[in-house]
Swiss-Prot record:
Coiled-coil regions listed: none
Protein name, as recorded: LL-diaminopimelate aminotransferase
Catalyzed reactions per annotation: (2S,6S)-2,6-diaminopimelate + 2-oxoglutarate = (S)-2,3,4,5-tetrahydrodipicolinate + L-glutamate + H2O + H(+)
Pfam families: Aminotran_1_2
Gene: dapL
UniProt KW DNA-binding keyword: no
InterPro entries linked to this entry: Aminotransferase_I/II_large (IPR004839), DapL/ALD1 (IPR019942), PyrdxlP-dep_Trfase (IPR015424), PyrdxlP-dep_Trfase_major (IPR015421), PyrdxlP-dep_Trfase_small (IPR015422)
Residues at which pyridoxal 5'-phosphate binds: 72, 108-109, 132, 187, 218, 246-248, 257, 292
Record-listed E.C. numbers: 2.6.1.83
Length: 410
């Protein structure tokens, strides 16, 4: 008799974005003439930068020649890509990394889930609320939690409320925790953390022998020079933090798939017998066993992002999305809504009007404005009464969506 993993049955509902897709499809089928504008899921719309596309094509051509053919590559990623990232993305921040401390993957969503393989189940995990659903759901799936209560909180996870009172930046937990998820710039709230705020977390982690999972998927969208792009800009972070980055939004790789994890050699854990052991070694062992590496053409395309031409073109695309964010942010303010984010992040986090629930506002925008956003409650109980809009649309659609919402709410 084949038994299932019963932990999956603890999940309260379907993953947020498929549920949004289901509702939108049902509306579109019932209203075939409606022009639905999607500002919900954070998928990109701009094409790859020309320099990146050129490198992609050249790498595919390599596979058609005997001399340049590439088969299995190193599971950790090619050194030429890792070194390009370190030189162009970390050294300018004053961060020194070794080649074997970085791992190339097929995306940070997978990494945020897979990293749990090397941590014991009895670790106490702390996550923000609202939060990117993957952090919560993957801990449920592997069996770290009990059942969810009526609010949706799972027994065994420490939830850190992020609200207007704390400017959507969680406070240090009052109890001791072992793993801390931080995401800045934040998804879904669009907020960022200062050096002083991050230093509090690093100090807490080092004092409590905890590990920070730092999701920096949106660091390329930071416009304020005072805001850190990496947790490793903070003194002491290389002893306690694992950082995740993604090419999905930075370079438009949502359909290409490439990400990276930094696991410094100094980040240590404790065995069941009390000995200290490097998480870097564990992650390398896990990677070489369960992953064959990102594809050669994808890594060549990623490398091209860091060329002078590639980065200039990539930055232009990022600027395009951030102009969309400005348009949405200002438009929602003109509509009389309370708005957060959209300055150092491609997400706008707004309060729903007149005390509406998040899903009621979703249905209102869908049926009355034909605009799709993301209900804040889908990111956790503290997201109730909020709503996320994404800046990753086409400019003309963003402008039209904003005008529709303004007209409807005024």
């Amino acid at each position: 008799m084949a038994l299932i993993n019963d932990n999956y049955l603890k999940l309260k509902a379907g993953y947020l974005f498929p549920e949004i897709g289901r509702r939108v499809r049902a509306f579109a089928e019932a209203n075939p003439s409606a022009k639905v504008i999607r500002l919900g899921i954070g998928d990109v719309t701009r094409p790859l930068a020309p320099a990146v596309l050129k490198a992609f094509h050249a790498a595919v051509d390599d596979l058609g020649t005997t001399d340049n053919f590439a088969g299995y590559g190193p599971e950790q990623g090619y050194d030429w890509l890792i070194n390009a990232i370190i030189e162009k993305s970390y050294k300018p921040l004053g961060v020194s990394l070794k080649t074997d401390e970085m791992f190339i993957s097929d995306g940070s969503k997978c990494d945020c889930a897979n990293i749990l393989d090397i941590f014991a189940l009895d670790n106490v995990v702390a996550i923000g609320d609202p939060v990117y659903p993957v952090y919560n759901d993957t801990n449920v799936m592997i069996g770290r939690t009990g059942e969810a209560d009526d609010k949706g909180y799972y027994k065994g996870i420490v939830y850190m409320p992020c609200n207007e009172e704390n400017h959507f930046i969680p406070s240090l937990p009052t109890e001791k925790v072992d793993i801390i998820y931080l995401c800045f710039p934040n998804n879904p709230t669009g907020t960022v953390a200062s050096r002083a705020e991050l230093k509090k977390w690093v100090d807490y982690a080092n004092a409590n022998d905890a590990v920070i999972f730092f999701d920096a998927a949106y660091e390329a969208f930071i416009t304020d020079p005072e805001i850190p792009h990496s947790i490793y800009e903070i003194e002491g972070a290389k002893k306690c933090a694992i950082e995740f980055r993604s090419f999905s939004k930075t370079a438009g790789f949502t359909g290409v798939r490439c990400g990276l994890v930094v696991v410094p050699e100094e980040v240590m854990g404790t065995t069941s017998t009390g000995e200290r052991y490097s998480f870097n070694k564990l992650w390398l062992r896990r990677t070489t066993t369960k992953f064959n590496g990102a594809s050669y053409p994808v890594q060549r395309a990623a490398e091209a992002v860091y060329s002078d031409e590639g980065w200039k073109q990539t930055k232009e695309i990022i600027d395009y999305y951030m102009e969309n964010a400005r348009i949405i942010r200002e438009g929602m303010k003109e509509a009389g809504l309370t708005v957060y984010g959209g300055v150092n992040a491609p997400y706008i986090w707004l309060k729903t009007p007149a005390g509406m629930t998040s899903w009621d506002f979703f249905d209102k925008l869908l049926t009355e404005c034909n605009v799709v956003g993301t209900p804040g409650s889908g990111f956790g109980p503290s997201g109730e009464g909020y709503f996320r809009l994404s800046a990753f649309g086409h400019r003309e659609n963003v402008i039209e969506a904003v005008e529709r919402i303004k007209k409807n709410l005024k």
